């Protein structure tokens, strides 16, 4: 998932690429588009229900998906999940949109993903 809080992000023209992505995501300043965007915005569609185990990853220096979006998304998901499954947040403190650069750093991120998946499957 890329933008977790579509409405807030696309309302902030100071965020890089926002205005260039109106054609793809919609422009919340347009009333009809706002209500359409609300139907697919992950953050705005969290409700009380069972959710699977979730690992959300982000990078502090991601210019395309601001780090505070997943930091806001995860606690709301935890609050509304009725399943008891874990919801984790991993913040990369040095990487950008593509994560850490370098072969070993990238492998560490992949290892985190596989570790999470294998741990959940073994429960």
Residue ranges and their predicted role:
Residues 4-123:
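Active-site-proximal cap/loop segments of hydrolase catalytic domains
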């Amino acid at each position: 998932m890329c933008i977790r809080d579509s409405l807030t992000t696309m309302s902030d023209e100071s965020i890089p690429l926002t205005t260039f992505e109106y054609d793809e995501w919609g422009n919340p300043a347009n009333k009809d588009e706002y209500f359409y965007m609300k139907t697919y915005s992950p953050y705005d569609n969290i409700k009380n229900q069972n959710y699977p185990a979730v690992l959300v990853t982000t990078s502090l220096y991601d210019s395309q998906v601001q780090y505070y979006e997943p930091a806001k998304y995860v606690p709301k998901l935890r609050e509304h999940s009725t399943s008891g499954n874990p919801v984790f947040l991993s913040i990369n403190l040095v990487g950008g949109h593509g994560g850490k650069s370098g072969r070993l750093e990238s492998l560490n991120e992949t290892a985190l993903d596989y570790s999470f998946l294998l741990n959940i499957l073994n429960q």
